[in-house]
Amino acid sequence: MSLTNTFSDLCKSFAPDAFAINYTLAKNPELSSHEFESVKTIGTVLEKHGMDVTYEFCNLPTAFKASAVKVDNPKGRLAILCEYDALPEVGHACGHSASGSMSVLAALTLHKMQQDGVAFNMDIDIIGTPDEEATGCKVDMCNAEVFKDYDFAIMVHLDGEET
C-alpha cells in the first residue's frame, strides 16, 4: 500500500476523534487565554492514542505540546500548530474548532504511521497555540524562541471559500 493510501486510511480511522473535538469546541467556545476545556479535550484525545502531552507549555496556561513522531538522529523537525480559541459573541466563526481538529487529525495519523512501522527522518510535534484572536500568541512563542529548533511549521486554517 502506498504512503498516500496509508495516510488516507488512517485519517479516516481518526475522523471520529477529529469530529468530536470540533463539535465539542464549537458547542463550548472559549475566548483567548481561557481555552482550559478546549486544551483538556484535545489533550485527552492525544493521550488516548498514546501521545504524551505537556500542558502549560512555555509557561502559557492553555498551551500544549506533544510529540507525534520521534526518531533517532532526526534530519529535521516539524511543528504542527493547533489553534482553538473563539471570538467574543460569534464563537468559532474563524474556524479554529475545525482547523485545530484537523491539526490533531494530522498528528494522530503520523503518530500511528510511525507505530505501524513507517520510517520517518524527522521529529514531528503538535503545538497548541492559544490566544490567537486577542494577542496572537504565536508571536509571543516566537519571541520566546519556541520555534528556533524547528525547520518549519505548518497549520491548517479555514477560509470562507467553497471548494
Predicted regions and their residues:
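N-terminal capping segment at the start of a domain
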Residues: 2-36, 85
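A non-catalytic alpha/beta surface segment that caps or lines the substrate-entry region
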Residues: 29-72
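Buried hydrophobic packing segments
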Residues: 42, 102-110, 137-138
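Phosphate-handling active-site elements
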Residues: 54, 73-76, 106-125
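Histidine/acidic-residue-rich, glycine-tolerant segments that coordinate divalent metal ions
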Residues: 62-63, 67-68, 85-93, 97-98, ...
